[in-house]
Amino acid sequence: MGCVFGREAATTTTAEAKQAKSSKASSGVVVVGESSVTKSNGVIADDVEKKKNEEANGDKERKSSKGDRRRSTKPNPRLSNPSKHWRGEQVAAGWPSWLSDACGEALNGWVPRKADTFEKIDKIGQGTYSNVYKAKDMLTGKIVALKKVRFDNLEPESVKFMAREILVLRRLDHPNVVKLEGLVTSRMSCSLYLVFQYMDHDLAGLASSPVVKFSESEVKCLMRQLISGLEHCHSRGVLHRDIKGSNLLIDDGGVLKIADFGLATIFDPNHKRPMTSRVVTLWYRAPELLLGATDYGVGIDLWSAGCILAELLAGRPIMPGRTEVEQLHKIYKLCGSPSEDYWKKGKFTHGAIYKPREPYKRSIRETFKDFPPSSLPLIDALLSIEPEDRQTASAALKSEFFTSEPYACEPADLPKYPPSKEIDAKRRDEETRRQRAASKAQGDGARKNRHRDRSNRALPAPEANAELQSNVDRRRLITHANAKSKSEKFPPPHQDGGAMGVPLGASQHIDPTFIPRDMVPSFTSSSFNFSKDEPPTQVQTWSGPLGHPITGVSRKKKDNTKSSKGKRAVVA
């Protein structure tokens, strides 16, 4: 093919231009501005002229996605202000501007789903900030879980809290961590649905079922998956901050996934910042959080994991406190009271209030003496008062508990159970209460022995997150004013001295106030029997006098407690 020469526009007439254009078109050449480029090989005809222009004007060339070379005379908006570019693309794709501002790059590559493409089947979970539904994806036919995040308005604090879960989930990718599959948004309202894989069970629902009894190898299988998921979270700089049974989901294949990252946060151990201590459900809350620490790390998740391990082996929660004072008391009696150095180096806002008068001796090995011997060192480490002594998730996976026989079974080898979640246990208990109330209304005043088993044990409810305390208090006041509401009524934590109460949407089988104040569980061979020859024995449950739902003391002694009303609880 012959050479193509450039020409000066000033010396070329209109007729000559037309003639040149027609001749070049027939020879496969296209004119672009002042340059001619061949279609076949993209050779630039007037390179010399371009170089002169570049020297004169200082313009720079950039290569486009099509391979052409063009001059750029304006700053690239993508490079000068990438956040504006992303926001524009996201809004054009259908994302609400308030969500784009809050989540930034986390939305890149996604397209918002519409609510009418899902069909709700059943409500499967409820919390302080969200409801979870079983739903069908009408586009794929797949069963999914929809988590509806509730927030009253588009205040920056509310939106930031909601967006944090999305940002955290986009950081994580592990078989034992729930995966965010999509988002359902609305341009007209402050509603947002998070789309997850549907899971048939949660650990709290299975553990509370009277027909479920985990063997040692099954406990190892579940705990190995839990700690593996935590190891991944911590390696990605994520603290979960609410590890408990109802947040550990299990599918039909026995795979456990850590879920509900609503209280999770991103942390950097090399650049620490103050964080709220009002996290983690009370029964699984580490002592440093109860004492008001704002400088903490992975140890709070490992403490919760230790509580879960002991609970699976014992068949019930090991420290079911009702208030922060009582929870600390139970921790001191089981794990021992902190040393003097602990109080000196720790910056605790409540240290002076909750410091015990007399030191407590650590009694984990004595209390859990009937547990499998290989489990005791791991429980002892995870339930250390000093956060540093809890080590790491990686160290826990290398402990004797996982490297000794019987080894952990494979997830697929776990028994198959009918779908069971914490909310199912709550519904069963509510139905039992309704039947009791109906019998009482019909004049059935005869006292009946109440059969109590693991399905009727109390489950803790999460306390409010301090970062959204104003919104939570507002919901509580509205609930209290609505006489027709079926929700539990309770005072804000900062008004009741940190009492656990019964938060909105809490799942529990019986009111924790029915548990006598001085009750301390005893973990004997009846709690966990790992003999190969004998079947597991029945779990012991409390059958003593019931406490009054308000005063928390025995009904028989109700009249004698008026003089002690209002006295402050003190850790002895």
Swiss-Prot record:
PROSITE patterns: PROTEIN_KINASE_ATP (PS00107), PROTEIN_KINASE_DOM (PS50011), PROTEIN_KINASE_ST (PS00108). Its EC number is 2.7.11.1. It is an enzyme of class 2 (transferase). Residues 118-402 form the Protein kinase domain. Residues 74-83 have a biased composition (Polar residues). InterPro entries: CDK (IPR050108), Kinase-like_dom_sf (IPR011009), Prot_kinase_dom (IPR000719), Protein_kinase_ATP_BS (IPR017441), Ser/Thr_kinase_AS (IPR008271). Residues 554-572 have a biased composition (Basic residues). Residues 1-89, 409-474, 526-572 are annotated as: Disordered. ATP binds at I124, G125, Q126, G127, T128, Y129, S130, N131, V132, K147. One of its GO terms (molecular function) is protein serine kinase activity. It catalyses: L-seryl-[protein] + ATP = O-phospho-L-seryl-[protein] + ADP + H(+); L-threonyl-[protein] + ATP = O-phospho-L-threonyl-[protein] + ADP + H(+). Residues 47-67, 419-434 have a biased composition (Basic and acidic residues). Keywords: ATP-binding, Kinase, Nucleotide-binding, Serine/threonine-protein kinase, Transferase. SMART domains: S_TKc (SM00220). The active site is at D242 (proton acceptor). Residues 9-40 have a biased composition (Low complexity). CDD domains: STKc_CDK9_like. The keyword Nucleotide-binding applies. Belongs to the protein kinase superfamily. Ser/Thr protein kinase family. This is Probable serine/threonine-protein kinase At1g54610. It comes from Arabidopsis thaliana (Mouse-ear cress).
